[in-house]
Amino acid sequence: MQRALASLPAPTPVRWWMWGIWGDLPAPNVFFPFGEKDAARLLHILGAYEGELERNDYRRLLTGRASANAALGSERVFGFGTPRASALPYAEVLTEVRRVGHRWMASRAHLLDEGPLPDERFDVDLTAWLDAPSVRQLVGPIREVLDENAG
């Protein structure tokens, strides 16, 4: 992502939605609740990835994460002590940022279907987090499948 963004002429406006699949997002600001019908549709779509599902049953991940996010997501997005944002059984959390000049700015927390208000200021600066080196950049590969033929 960083290489793709670096190739854009500045200041190209960009909206970036991040989904924390391999680790939690430190600053989620979007909450998306969904029900059984949507979960069934997502599981059907996931079925197209036969090779990945042979390697690991990501169907369990989809419903397990979504159940956990339904329980924890409201407080992660809207703040500790916040009542649950939806009675639906599943949810996803995302971090949405916009590039403003050379900064990555987030808006207030909101439901996905609401979106930020039209005049909402994106005034939470997440640039330091997004420009920080990844763990892989800091310490190298940890648990990656390495190409045995690489030299």
Predicted features along the sequence, with ranges:
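Metal-dependent de-N-acetylase/amidase catalytic core
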Residues: 1-149
